[in-house]
């Protein structure tokens, strides 16, 4: 069975607080795996590390056998400062731990190319949007829908991440075909989560349970290999929880 996700010895510290302590886990293709723990145990922080929101204090994350997140070699970097000056790093480190010339060159090259990557561990580590493009999607513990958009448009916007339009296709007027295809796929996703009848309503007008399902549809719109659901049943009533459990299963 193919390994999709491997989390190796991940620790995440914020000052003196250890939010995640030496987490190791694997997810294989076709598996449903639950990360269980009480409130405040660090589940959301673990998801944030896996999806590139945080750079871990120690450990690494591999997705489809490729390392996508790993700690700074000193083990003392608590946070990535995306797109900022290397001085932001050296100010946090002792003089003997200042960034090497190789690291500075890598940062300058990234800035020159205006790459949407964060600088960490002398490599260009993918940001959350790049990790999503690699095939990993997630939902959030606190709902983060686009409030001013309809149910349909919330999913369509996410679908555009996979759009393959370019200058060549535009010149041949092929963009319209892709737009039609994506709109059809959005409708299929809304049917899958039982929201096709409210597709034209504003996302925030939906009951809480349906907003949760919309978040899942939006995540699925990116065509992920791996889908991370952060407490998907939080705040739901028993009926909504049962419906969601049946859907996930």
Language model feature labels by segment:
Residues 2-249:
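Glycine-rich phosphate-binding loops of nucleotide-dependent enzymes
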